[in-house]
């Protein structure tokens, strides 16, 4: 309890002393402000007189700093009324030609004339709304001068597109085919024209290649209905067109036959079936199994076997009967048209090999009988 009472008494003493010091500082500040005001008025400043060393630092912080007087270092020349009148006359005569206005006035430089004109024009624009029309004559502000063209400008694209003349070969093709220049290809060969025998049989390069291969292989077949020549059908104008990077041959039919025979229709349908088979099985390593739709035998394993028999062995009636039965089975009928063609080819090859082994065994038996 005694400690607490002593602490409380000491704290009260500190507060009372702080109040006394604060009152003293306030009184001293009022006296200092009065002295400063009197010194500023009289032009004398005796700051060290009547100041205690304890309060000197505090007064230095609170002293109002006097701003340094502003001195104009740049001498701005004013425009007289005579110079301004000459300026207005020169603007009416020369517009924004500052060099000519400088010669007309004679006392101002071009830079000064330009700055004066900018200020004058802005002032005229502000006073244009408030000014009455009859009081003061309006001064016409000259339009700004056009910008100088650059001496060395950057290269720019020409506004007119460059039109390139088509090559002579292309123009010659246009006259013959009467087709637009943007789609025609610049190279057309006679081989592509002669590939197709009729417009119905080929319309692209893939079909034309298939047609040429069939024409070459038809020499080995024994067909009852020969193909028609190009001279019989008639020359048709053919134009080559590039679509998505591929060359397509388009044949324009000059005249179509009025009526088709039954044989021609069968031949055309069989050719379409053959082309579909060629397109599907071109990449197969086992080969192509073709149906005998054109009325002729194919170049498959059956015909090869028959040719080998004709060249090598003597004619045997039983073997030829078996081969003829196999050829009849491979003819064009709806049953054999469907199914997996390589599998059918394998079956036919097995039958042919079995028939060949039988023929060879018969020959050996006959030779043994003759030797005995």
UniProtKB/Swiss-Prot annotation:
One Pfam family from the record: Myb_DNA-binding
Biased composition (Polar residues): 178-204
Chief place of localization: nucleus
GO terms for cellular component: nucleus
InterPro entries per record: Homeodomain-like_sf, Myb_dom, Myb_dom_plants, SANT/Myb, SANT_dom
Span list, region Disordered: 124-204
Biased composition (Pro residues): 156-169
DNA-binding region, residue intervals: 98-121
Biased composition (Basic residues): 145-155
Places the protein is found: Nucleus
GO molecular function ontology, one term from the record: DNA binding
Keywords for the protein's UniProt record, in alphabetical order: Biological rhythms, DNA-binding, Nucleus, Transcription, Transcription regulation
Source taxon at top rank: Eukaryota
Record-linked NCBIfam families: myb_SHAQKYF
Its job: Transcription factor involved in phytochrome A-mediated cotyledon opening. Controlled by the central oscillator mediated by LHY and CCA1. Part of a regulatory circadian feedback loop. Regulates its own expression.
Protein name, per record: Protein REVEILLE 7
Species: Arabidopsis thaliana (Mouse-ear cress)
């Amino acid at each position: 309890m005694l400690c607490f009472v002593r602490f409380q008494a000491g704290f009260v003493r500190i507060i009372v002393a702080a109040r006394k010091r604060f009152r003293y500082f306030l009184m001293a500040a009022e006296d200092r402000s009065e002295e400063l005001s009197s010194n500023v008025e009289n032009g004398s400043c005796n700051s060290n007189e009547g100041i205690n060393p304890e309060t000197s630092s505090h007064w230095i912080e609170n002293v109002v700093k006097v701003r340094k007087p502003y001195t104009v270092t740049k001498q701005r020349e004013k425009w007289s009324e005579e110079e301004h009148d000459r300026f207005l006359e020169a603007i009416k005569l020369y517009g924004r030609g500052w060099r000519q206005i400088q010669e007309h006035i004679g006392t101002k430089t071009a830079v000064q004339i330009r700055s004066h004109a900018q200020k004058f024009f802005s002032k005229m624009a502000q006073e244009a709304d408030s000014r009455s029309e009859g009081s003061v004559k309006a001064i016409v502000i000259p339009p700004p001068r056009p910008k100088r063209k650059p001496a060395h400008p950057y290269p720019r694209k020409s506004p007119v597109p460059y039109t390139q003349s088509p090559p002579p070969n292309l123009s010659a093709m246009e006259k013959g085919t009467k087709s637009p220049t943007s789609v025609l290809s610049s190279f057309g060969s006679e081989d592509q024209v002669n590939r197709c025998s009729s417009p119905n049989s080929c319309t692209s390069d893939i079909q034309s290649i298939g047609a040429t291969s069939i024409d070459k292989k038809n020499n080995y077949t024994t067909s009852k209905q020969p193909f028609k020549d190009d001279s019989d059908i008639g020359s048709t104008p053919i134009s080559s067109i590039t679509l998505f990077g591929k060359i397509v041959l388009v044949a324009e039919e000059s005249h179509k036959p009025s009526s088709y025979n039954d044989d021609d229709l069968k031949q055309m349908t069989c050719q379409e079936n053959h082309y579909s088979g060629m397109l599907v099985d071109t990449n197969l390593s086992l080969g192509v199994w073709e149906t005998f739709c054109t009325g002729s035998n194919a170049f498959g394993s059956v015909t090869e076997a028959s040719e080998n028999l004709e060249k090598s062995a003597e004619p045997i009636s039983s073997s030829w009967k078996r081969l003829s039965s196999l050829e009849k089975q491979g003819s064009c009928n709806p049953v054999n048209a469907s199914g997996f063609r390589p599998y059918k080819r394998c079956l036919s090859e097995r039958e042919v090999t079995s028939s060949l082994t039988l023929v060879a065994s018969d020959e050996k038996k006959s030779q043994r009988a003759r030797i005995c």
